[in-house]
């Protein structure tokens, strides 16, 4: 094959490869669809409603270690990004080594207002994506961190066992 014929072929090949990568990343950044609700719960401290939580899975049931899972939190009050990150780090204490928490977490947890929704989607491959009001924020590929993050709400020894039971559809 002459050099003149190879260049157009390589250009077309590169264009197709880039298009495939672009479509894959676009598909992964779309808000998850087709999941069934497992359970829901309201999280309150004293008399303050903080958020409503809903958990979704492929078939509407929760089985530890299985994915995909989608956790949606709809907030009832304003909370700064810094407060969300700090509380997340506090809740991860004992579940995940603080030094190993991905630095991107600071960029992925936005400030929220009353009515805002923050969602975390754990894919079957262990990657986790964050969404804010349905808009893709970014993802973390650390499957150990992603599981520990969901365990804040789903672990048998979570700080709020009633919330955990309801999210798992047990009440």
Set out the residue ranges of the language-model regions.
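Bacterial N-terminal signal peptides that target proteins for export
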Residues: 2-13
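N-terminal signal peptide c-region/cleavage motif recognized by signal peptidases
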Residues: 22-24
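Terminal leader/tail segments of proteins
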Residues: 26-171
């Amino acid at each position: 094959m002459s050099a003149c014929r190879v260049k157009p072929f390589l250009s077309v090949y590169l264009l197709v490869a880039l298009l495939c990568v672009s479509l894959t990343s676009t598909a992964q950044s779309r808000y998850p669809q087709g999941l069934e609700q497992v359970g829901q719960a309201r999280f309150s401290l004293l008399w303050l409603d903080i958020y409503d939580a809903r958990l979704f899975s492929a078939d509407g049931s929760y089985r530890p270690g299985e994915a995909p899972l989608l956790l949606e939190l709809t907030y009832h009050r304003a909370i700064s990004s810094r407060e969300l990150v700090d509380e997340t780090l506090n809740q991860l204490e004992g579940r995940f080594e603080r030094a190993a928490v991905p630095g991107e977490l600071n960029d992925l947890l936005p400030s929220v207002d009353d009515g805002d929704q923050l969602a975390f989607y754990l894919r079957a491959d262990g990657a986790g994506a964050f969404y804010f009001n349905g808009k893709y924020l970014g993802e973390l590929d650390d499957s150990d961190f992603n599981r520990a993050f969901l365990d804040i709400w789903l672990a048998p020894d979570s700080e709020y066992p009633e919330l955990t039971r309801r999210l798992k559809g047990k009440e």
